């Protein structure tokens, strides 16, 4: 699974216009940063609640921005949570933090190279 799906990014660029991509990308990157902060700063008992909320929110935004690996993981966590499957505070939260960070870094690199 691709970290960033270039075809989806190109499609988004075509739909909204190349001038709008940097603005929306900044908003998305800001969201990723806030999710990272929430998960890293949350108390032990709150981490799973935030993980569920963040996963639900990321399903559509990550898909829209072509963040396929992040979207796939968010869908997996959201589905497991809705089905009542136990989420692991350590493993699942750490995996989400890792995917958020990887996606953020990939977009920052892509942005630095002029989109």
Swiss-Prot record:
Please name the Gene3D superfamilies in this protein's record: HPT domain
Q: Which UniProt keywords apply?
A: Phosphoprotein, Two-component regulatory system
Modification type Phosphohistidine: residues? 56
Source organism superkingdom = Bacteria
Among the GO molecular function terms of this UniProt record, one is: protein kinase activity
* SUPFAM superfamilies from the UniProt entry: Histidine-containing phosphotransfer domain, HPT domain
Which stretches make up the HPt domain?
17-107
What processes in GO biological process is this protein linked to?
A: phosphorelay signal transduction system
Any Pfam family the entry gives:
Hpt
The UniProt entry, under InterPro entries, shows: HPT_dom_sf (IPR036641), QS_phosphorelay_intermediate (IPR053403), Sig_transdc_His_kin_Hpt_dom (IPR008207)
Briefly, what is this protein's role? Phosphorelay protein which receives a sensory signal from a sensor kinase and transmit it to LuxO. At low cell density, a phosphoryl group is transferred from the sensor kinase, probably on His-56 and this phosphoryl group is further transferred to LuxO.
How the protein assembles, per its UniProt entry?
A: Monomer.
Q: Would you tell me the protein name for this molecule?
A: Phosphorelay protein LuxU
Species per Swiss-Prot/TrEMBL record: Vibrio vulnificus (strain YJ016)
């Amino acid at each position: 699974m691709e970290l960033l799906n270039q075809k989806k990014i190109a499609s988004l660029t075509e739909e909204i216009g190349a001038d709008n991509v940097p603005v929306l990308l900044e908003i998305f990157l800001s969201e990723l940063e806030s999710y990272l902060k929430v998960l890293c700063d949350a108390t032990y008992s709150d981490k799973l609640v935030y993980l569920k909320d963040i996963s639900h929110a990321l399903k559509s935004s990550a898909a829209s921005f072509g963040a396929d690996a992040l979207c796939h993981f968010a869908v997996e966590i959201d589905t497991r949570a809705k089905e009542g499957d136990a989420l692991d505070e350590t493993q699942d939260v750490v995996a989400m933090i890792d995917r958020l960070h990887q996606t953020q870094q990939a977009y920052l690199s892509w942005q630095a190279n002029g989109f």
